[in-house]
């Protein structure tokens, strides 16, 4: 755990191909890190593993990854896109919060647990909205019918001004619209 925590001057890191485990907050607040490839043997990204890597612009996740922990990419302020492998079966809430450059999240069609609709991350069943990319174009968003829950910090920092909620919505997570420009919901 916390192997490289707060190594602010670390700009490059080559993780060994044999690596299988990253500890909680292993690279948290490595503010100078710009790119990273997670080795193929890593199956789980723990909570806050890359949180605060504000200069990270390129990230490659392994095809066999199964779990992305809570806040794993929180405050990765320079990432513009994230591609979630088909093998991922769990994504913790706030995994993609406070990412002001995030334009889109990609999920492969063969992922059985998650999907994206116009770059917005939802469970495959479409009942939970987990993350809305901060810089997604437009000032209005209609939450898809069938969504019953909006995750914690899901719309953090969005430039949306208008959000329409479906009749199906039952729960809005903590601080779901924190630091957004929302005027009408």
Residue ranges and their predicted role:
Residues 7-21, 31-44, 54-67, 76-90, ...:
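Structural signature of tandem-repeat unit edges
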